[in-house]
């Protein structure tokens, strides 16, 4: 069934990095915000690498991101998908990142997982390169489906996000 992205991107004029997922999971679509599946490790990984308590409410999550210069969105604005599996995504329509790039100071784009990176490479690479001068960086997915990566390994891999936020 065709799904359209239900959320607006989270960013402001102080956002320095953009983290792109592939498309909201079924629990996220149901609960109305990014990475809402409690099994997804996104919020815990970010909190760990940034030495902060994990945000819990939607308002806390937005404040957490914006206070640290982080923008989030997804690489696909529309797709055919059953459930939450990236492997079952077809008929992908890429997101328009221009409003984020024109409204923020994004210096690096990170793809949360293989499917997000694939969409970036196939559809969004030129837009990302024009805006940042850098290729999108693939990070291991925080999804519970990525069982190959335990929490500690995710934290190690995602530390580059904290490094660029700190060092600029």
Regions found by a protein language model. Give the residues of each.
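C-terminal capping/extension of enzyme domains
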Residues: 1-16, 37-38, 83-98, 121-168
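Short, glycine/serine-rich, charged loops/turns that create anion-binding
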Residues: 24-27, 77, 116, 143
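Short, surface-exposed acidic-centric catalytic microdomains
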Residues: 27-88
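Hydrophobic packing residues within well-ordered alpha-helices of enzyme cores
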Residues: 46, 119-120
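Internal catalytic-core helix/loop-beta-alpha segment
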Residues: 67-118
């Amino acid at each position: 069934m065709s799904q359209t992205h239900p959320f607006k991107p989270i960013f402001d004029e102080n956002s320095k990095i953009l983290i792109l997922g592939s498309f909201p999971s079924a629990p996220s679509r149901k609960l109305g915000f990014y990475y809402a599946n409690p099994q997804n490790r996104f919020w815990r990984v970010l909190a760990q690498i940034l030495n902060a308590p994990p945000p819990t409410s939607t308002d806390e999550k937005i404040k957490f991101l914006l206070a640290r210069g982080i923008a989030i969105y997804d690489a696909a604005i529309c797709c055919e998908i059953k459930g939450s599996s990236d492997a079952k995504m077809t008929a992908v329509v890429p997101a328009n990142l221009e409003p984020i790039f024109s409204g923020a100071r994004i210096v690096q784009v990170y793809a949360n997982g293989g499917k997000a990176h694939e969409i970036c490479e196939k559809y969004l690479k030129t837009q990302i390169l024009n805006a940042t001068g850098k290729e999108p960086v693939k990070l291991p997915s925080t999804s519970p489906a990525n069982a190959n990566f335990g929490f500690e390994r995710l934290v190690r891999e995602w530390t580059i996000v904290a490094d660029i936020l700190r060092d600029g």
